[in-house]
Amino acid sequence: MRLLLFILLNTTLLSTNYVHARPSVSHTTLASQFKFAEKADIFVTHTNINEDRTQDEKTIKLSGTFSPVGSNYETGGDIVQVSSFRACDARRKGLDNTVFEHVPVVFYDDVEKFLTGCVALDNQARFAEKSGAMALIVGPASRVERTTRPMMIGGSKIPVIVLDDEQTERLRSELRSASERGAVTKLRISFIDEKPTKVLKLQVFRPTVLNITLLGLLIILIVFVSLLVVVKIRCQPTMHRELWLRALARTALTKMEIRSFQKEKNVEAGQKKKTSSTFARLKQHRSSSSRHSSYLAVFGSLTSVAQSSSHSAQERCVICLEEYEEGTELRVLFCGHEFHPKCVDPWLLSKRRCPLCQFDVVYKHYPKVDSPEKLSGRSDDTTSLLPRTSPSEDLPSAPSSRSTRLTRPYRTTHHLIPSSTRPSSHQRPSLQPTAPRTRSCPRRRQLRSRNQIDFSIRIGGYSSDVSSSHAEQSRSFEIEPRTSQQL
């Protein structure tokens, strides 16, 4: 009965080996030929104690090859020589505790054929791994080939180094001499770089300080050039428009009048003198206009630049705040304001507007005003500017102090006109409220004195602010025609 069971068991094992024989041929061939790309250097070191109790350390270098039945990494430890038959007694004696955290060395001597499976390389590697060894050194390679068999189970996780015949003999003699002297032999395994210039190690960019600096500068240069291109593309239309408007402003400067400033000795002499060229043009335009085209006073012009009653124009430039000297050349803008050419020319070329009234010298118009719907909500500002329908009627009351300041100059002018030439209420034309002029710059100077008033005269689409002194000079052609025709 036992014989029958033994025969059945052997038959099953043989059939299993036959089924798995063909897939494992490749493993057997690789293990037998030992053609592996990775090799290892084995440094064997032992300390000799001389007679004078001095220590002498001796190190030899051996060359081996990583076996496919184990892993391939660098390690080290003390060397322990183990018999090749110790793995066969694993069931009876158990694991070998002497190789724990050491490197066992197994020398294959003449091994009988019936013991081939017991002393095979994969069995030795698994036994050393289970015993806690750091690595396994076997040799010679010619005898290891005869003990190989198809690997039925996965390989070991510790490095397995196979030595050739010459290296095995050197290691054997070194261990023998160290054993005679009673020295502990240590072993260290490291990789061998057979090809110093491997293709895999060729690097296009080496991370050196110079290369990193050059790369950073190149990136900064690329970003800077990209930003320049983007800014140029985005600002190109604006630049063309600015150049075009600047050329138009330069053309407008060539068409503006330049006059010499002259101071008058007294007011009476100035009244008898010939009016300035600006008011001469105003008088000529008024004489050519219709009877109903009257120059109505705009109360918003009361906030214009204050002028002294004893002078015919501004005494100083509002830009540089320098007083005008006799014979100084002044540039007269289309709106009537005067400045030093050196002060106002750069401003007009860049801004194209009068610094005082914001009159556009290129398009020749004032800034756009708000719509009537928006102006209806500003009753506190426009109510004080509404004209009177009759001489006896006062201006509408307003909470602001500005309306009080505006009514008194009007009354002063009203009393200055003789009663004989004072118009009746039914002849006075109806005054339409004008929208306040929007100005981007704040009010620069305080209101003029009470006995002064400015008339905003609109001629040919242009507007000019005239001081009371000019009004006194031009009263002969301003007030009298009104009394005879419309007033």
Curated annotation (Swiss-Prot):
Pathway: Protein modification; protein ubiquitination. Residues 382-406, 418-435 have a biased composition (Polar residues). It comes from the Eukaryota. The keyword Transmembrane helix applies. Autoubiquitinated. CDD domains: RING-H2_RNF43-like. It is found in: Cell membrane; Early endosome; Late endosome; Perikaryon. Residues 1-21 form the signal peptide. GO terms for molecular function: ubiquitin protein ligase activity; ubiquitin-protein transferase activity; zinc ion binding. The chain crosses the membrane at residues 211-231. A zinc finger (RING-type) spans 317-358. Residues 370-381, 472-481 have a biased composition (Basic and acidic residues). One of its GO terms (cellular component) is early endosome. Disruption phenotype: Mutants exhibit cell migration and axon guidance defects in HSN, AVK, CAN and AVG neurons, and also display excretory canal elongation defects with premature termination of the canal. Double knockout with either unc-53 or vab-8 results in premature termination of the AVG axon and AVG polarity defects. Residues 370-487 are annotated as: Disordered. Keywords: Cell membrane, Cell projection, Endosome, Glycoprotein, Membrane, Metal-binding, Signal, Transferase, Transmembrane, Transmembrane helix, Ubl conjugation, Ubl conjugation pathway, Wnt signaling pathway, Zinc, Zinc-finger. Its EC number is 2.3.2.-. Glycans are attached at residue 10. GO terms for biological process: negative regulation of Wnt signaling pathway; protein ubiquitination; ubiquitin-dependent protein catabolic process; Wnt signaling pathway. Expressed in a subset of head, ventral nerve cord and tail neurons, the excretory canal and tail epidermis. Probable E3 ubiquitin-protein ligase that acts as a negative regulator of the Wnt signaling pathway by mediating the ubiquitination, endocytosis and subsequent degradation of Wnt receptor complex components Frizzled. Acts on both canonical and non-canonical Wnt signaling pathway. Plays a role in the migration and axon guidance of different neuronal cell types including CAN, HSN, AVK and AVG. The RING finger region is required to block Wnt signaling and is also required for endosomal localization. Belongs to the ZNRF3 family. This is Probable E3 ubiquitin-protein ligase plr-1. It comes from Caenorhabditis elegans.
